[in-house]
Amino acid sequence: MTVPVRGFSLLRGRLGRAPALGRSTAPSVRAPGEPGSAFRGFRSSGVRHEAIIISGTEMAKHIQKEIQRGVESWVSLGNRRPHLSIILVGDNPASHTYVRNKIRAASAVGICSELILKPKDVSQEELLDVTDQLNMDPRVSGILVQLPLPDHVDERTICNGIAPEKDVDGFHIINIGRLCLDQHSLIPATASAVWEIIKRTGIQTFGKNVVVAGRSKNVGMPIAMLLHTDGEHERPGGDATVTIAHRYTPKEQLKIHTQLADIIIVAAGIPKLITSDMVKEGAAVIDVGINYVHDPVTGKTKLVGDVDFEAVKKKAGFITPVPGGVGPMTVAMLLKNTLLAAKKIIY
C-alpha cells in the first residue's frame, strides 16, 4: 500500500496521476520500510497531517553504494580507478568544510582524489595553468574548482578552462549548452541532486506547475531546464510548466505563483523566504538554500534553508530539510559525474 498524505497517496492525488516522470510510469513507492519499497529514505512522524520528510542523507547513502559498485566493476575490467582533482583557493572555512566532505565521500566509494590548495591572492593565469595541466593528465578523470573564488578571478573563465569531459561540476559552457539542448551532458551537481530527489521519491512532474525561486546559472537555471524539457528527448526532462522567480520578483507576486505550484524549489539564499501561507496543501517543497543565522536559543550560528521548515512541513506533502536534504545529494551526484567522466560515457 502507498502512504496517504493529506488526502492523496505518493503516486496519486494532488500531485497528479501516473505516469510520473516524462511519459513513463513511476515505480511504486511504498511506506518507509515496507517490503518492495522503491526507496526507504523517508522519515515520517507517523502523523499523517505532516509532510513526508525526504532524507537526502539516506538517499545519498543509497546512491553512493550504487556508485561504489560501479567503480569496482569498472576497475575490475582493468580500467584506471576514477580520480578527482579539487582546486581550493583561499581559506574560506565553509569551502574547506565542503571540500573535506567531498574528499571523504570520494574515498568511501573508491574514487581517488587530490586537493590542490592555492592562496587567495593567486592569479587567474596561474589557476588556468593548473587546469591546463590537469586537463592533459591522463590519470585525472574529473576536475572541480571550489566556488566562490576571490573577486579578482573570473569564475566563468576558470570553469571554462576545464575540459568539458572532465568538468564534473557541469559548469563549462559546453555542458550548459548541451543541457539546454536536451542533450546528454555532465549536469551541475545541485540541479542533478534536485532532479534525482524528485525521481526517486516518485513526485509527479508531467504537466505540473513548478516554481523555481532562484535563477543562478549554476543552480536555478539548470533545475528549471531539467524540469520543463521534453520527457522524450535525448536527455529526458520533466515536462512541467516552470516559473522562475528571482530577487526582483515582488513577494506578493511570488506568493501568487507558489500557491499554484505542485512543486516549489527554493535556491535564493534568503532564510524563511517561503512561509506556510505561500504553499498549497500537499505540495512538494525542495529547499536548496544555505544560510547561516544566529540561533537565539543556543547563542550559536546554525544552518538553515530558505523555507520556514517547521511551519511548511505541516502543510506540504513532501519537504527536504536543511541540513540533511539536498546537500548530501549534491555530493553524491558529483561522485556520479566523476564516474561518468572516467568511463567517458558522455564524451
From Swiss-Prot:
Location within or outside the cell: Mitochondrion inner membrane
Pathway: One-carbon metabolism; tetrahydrofolate interconversion
Reactions catalysed according to its record: (6R)-5,10-methylene-5,6,7,8-tetrahydrofolate + NAD(+) = (6R)-5,10-methenyltetrahydrofolate + NADH; (6R)-5,10-methenyltetrahydrofolate + H2O = (6R)-10-formyltetrahydrofolate + H(+); (6R)-5,10-methylene-5,6,7,8-tetrahydrofolate + NADP(+) = (6R)-5,10-methenyltetrahydrofolate + NADPH
Stored InterPro entries: Aminoacid_DH-like_N_sf (IPR046346), NAD(P)-bd_dom_sf (IPR036291), THF_DH/CycHdrlase (IPR000672), THF_DH/CycHdrlase_cat_dom (IPR020630), THF_DH/CycHdrlase_CS (IPR020867), THF_DH/CycHdrlase_NAD-bd_dom (IPR020631)
Regions crossing the membrane: none
Origin superkingdom: Eukaryota
Protein role: Bifunctional mitochondrial folate-interconverting enzyme that has both NAD/NADP-dependent methylenetetrahydrofolate dehydrogenase and methenyltetrahydrofolate cyclohydrolase activities.
Name the record gives this protein: Bifunctional methylenetetrahydrofolate dehydrogenase/cyclohydrolase 2, mitochondrial
Organism: Homo sapiens
